[in-house]
Amino acid sequence: MGGLHQGHQQLIRRAAEPRSGAEPACIVSVFVNPLQFGRGEDFDRYPRDLDRDRDLAAEAGAQALFAPSLEAMFPQGEAEITRIRPPTSLADRLCGHSRPGHFEGVATIVCRLLTLVKPQRLVMGEKDWQQLVILRRVVADLGLAVTLEGCATVRGLDSLACSSRNRYLSEAEAATATALPQALAQAALDSRSDPGAEGLAAAVRARLEASGLRPDYVELVRAHNLTPLQRVEGLTLLAAAAYCGPSRLIDHVFLMSRAPIVAIDGPAGAGKSTATRALAHRLGLLYLDTGAMYRALTWWVREQGVDPADAAAIAPLLQDLDLRLLGGVDGEQQVLINGHDVSTAIRSPEVTALVSIVAAHGCVR
């Protein structure tokens, strides 16, 4: 909607990245959408500085700025435009509870912009995660010919999420506003010992109020569909909105009920195992040597005297195979096949020469 900042510039840089050797044309839309503002909200004072927006967009790699007039967006007037209503299960909770009609206004104008511009890709920020989830659903349900990509939230040095509305904040209010990301970050730590929604939300509210912020909501939901949760389950979103003076701030943090999975890939001999083992040790994760698994299966195929290129002959060998990797977080893993330690045998030159052939078979993968 204009009022461009560092977060918008990151979106533009992402959109302008070369794809398949070609440099895409990056178009930035600027339109302060009246449909997504409720009565008494800040439509009239929302930041508008098209010259500054143009300069920031060009600096980040945009080739064009699309800033349509109200007449261009609403040829028959605002009241006559066809509205897009997202599912209430997505639009009426979190921010939608206190801003009725907001996401209908967002979806309507985004669809209108997509119709006018016809882009191949649409890049949007994750700061308003609910908006991103809703628009993904709208794009999917309407079969729109565009790929919607999310881009991680950009934050200032004070951890406050970049927002056009941050310029409403006085110096003192800006300092107070940092309590929101700080409270969510602390909740992420607390969730490891107490993953319950009630306790996490109450703790965040207490920290916000103690800092002088007025909470609007603090809720724990499933990240992909915004379904309310009673405790952290899988990929979970802890979302919050709070008022700092007259300004409404939103933020969120992702929580998980298990440790994350980190995969490192690269060419043979590049040091993947060394780097992955070190990373697992630093982060307290379990190191899983998938390369050793492929080597073990290759060793087994050789032991059975089967042609490494014959997938049909290999498949039966895997039916009752017992393959185990044993070891600690940072130690070398012991590889067992049917109870036999093959940790050393799988590193032989003979096995190494055949791994890529065996690993290419679907039954092995």
Regions found by a protein language model. Name each.
Residues I264:
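Hydrophobic anchor at the beta1->P-loop junction of P-loop NTPases
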Residues M1-N225, V253, G339:
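Nucleotidyltransferase catalytic core that binds NTPs
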Residues V232-L235, C244-I261:
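Extreme N-terminal, non-catalytic leader segments
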Residues M293-R365:
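ATP-dependent small-molecule kinase phosphotransfer cores
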Residues L11, A275, L279:
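Hydrophobic positions on the alpha1 helix immediately C-terminal to the Walker A/P-loop
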Residues K272:
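Conserved lysine of the Walker
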Residues A280-T290, E303-D307:
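Post-Walker A helix-loop "phosphate-sensing" segment adjacent to the P-loop in P-loop NTPases
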Residues G269:
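Walker A (P-loop) phosphate-binding loop of P-loop NTPases
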